[in-house]
């Protein structure tokens, strides 16, 4: 049997209990076809980068699966039929990762230094250019226009 990581996105208007029921349904499909489901993570309701089937948010779920290819094909077939599943992706892996996935790990932002004064430094000088004057658009005297020949 092969090892897989499977992630699917469920519609935003279903509840968390319905997402758990979907996970259990697909877990049952895998087990009925001779596979095992290891870690199951529910990442919750997250914003999508772009709309998928008129949804701006989706419930994310991850499953670590040890199953034959036929079990994965059957699960994906049922996901294509289901209206609650927006997208899914199954990836074959060498081994399953231990511990929580990257989406569930708390990001430690303390290692960043303080950001004093924004992230841009002071304006640099451009050598022979005069200093910039904001709002002062005077560029010196302008010569008079020549008379137009085509005026009637």
From Swiss-Prot:
Q: Has keyword Signal?
A: no
Q: Where is this region: Disordered?
A: 96-152
Q: Is the keyword Ribonucleoprotein in the record?
A: yes
Q: Which GO terms describe its molecular function?
A: small ribosomal subunit rRNA binding; structural constituent of ribosome
Which GO BP terms apply?
translation
Listed under GO cellular component are: cytosolic small ribosomal subunit
**Pfam families attached here?**
Ribosomal_S6
User: What function does this protein fulfil?
Assistant: Binds together with bS18 to 16S ribosomal RNA.
Q: What is this protein called?
A: Small ribosomal subunit protein bS6
Its lineage reads:
Bacteria, Pseudomonadati, Pseudomonadota, Alphaproteobacteria, Hyphomicrobiales
């Amino acid at each position: 049997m092969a090892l897989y990581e499977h992630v699917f996105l469920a519609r935003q208007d279903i509840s968390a209990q319905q997402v758990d029921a979907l996970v259990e349904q697909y877990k049952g499909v895998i087990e009925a076809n001779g596979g095992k489901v290891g870690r199951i993570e529910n990442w919750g309701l997250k914003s999508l980068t772009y709309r998928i089937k008129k949804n701006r948010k989706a419930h994310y779920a991850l499953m670590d699966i040890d199953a034959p290819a036929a079990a994965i094909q059957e699960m994906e077939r049922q996901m294509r039929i289901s209206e609650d599943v927006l997208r899914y992706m199954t990836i074959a892996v060498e081994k399953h990762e231990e511990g929580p996935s990257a989406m569930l790990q708390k990001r430690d932002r303390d290692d960043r230094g303080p950001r004093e004064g924004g992230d841009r430094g002071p304006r640099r000088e451009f050598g022979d250019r005069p200093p910039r004057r904001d709002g002062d658009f005077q560029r010196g005297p302008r010569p008079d226009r020549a008379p137009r020949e085509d005026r009637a």
